Amino acid sequence: MKHWRNPYLVVRVDGVALVDFSNNEERIFKADELPDALAKLPASAWPYGRVVAVQENSVQGGTQDAVLIRRNRGILAGTLESMHVLINWVPSA
C-alpha cells in the first residue's frame, strides 16, 4: 500500500497510528485525538477524497492485545463514520 496517497492508519494496542510513508514514520494518536490530526492534514493529503486506508497491527501479544485492538478498531470506525470518512480496510500482513 505504499502507493496509497490518502491517510493510512494502523490500529494498534495503544491507539491508532497515522503512517507517513514518505518519511517512514508513524505518529500514534488516542482515538479522541485523531479527528484533529486528520483535520490538520493539507488538502493535498486527500487526492482520493474522504477515504482512508486502515489496517490492524498484525503483531499481537495475546488475548488482551486482541481485545484492545478490537476496541480501538470499533472506536476508530465510529469516529470516521461520524466524520463522513470512508474506510478502505486493508488485510493485515
What are these regions (language model features)?
Residues 1-93:
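Long, low-hydrophobicity, acidic/polar, solvent-exposed interaction domains
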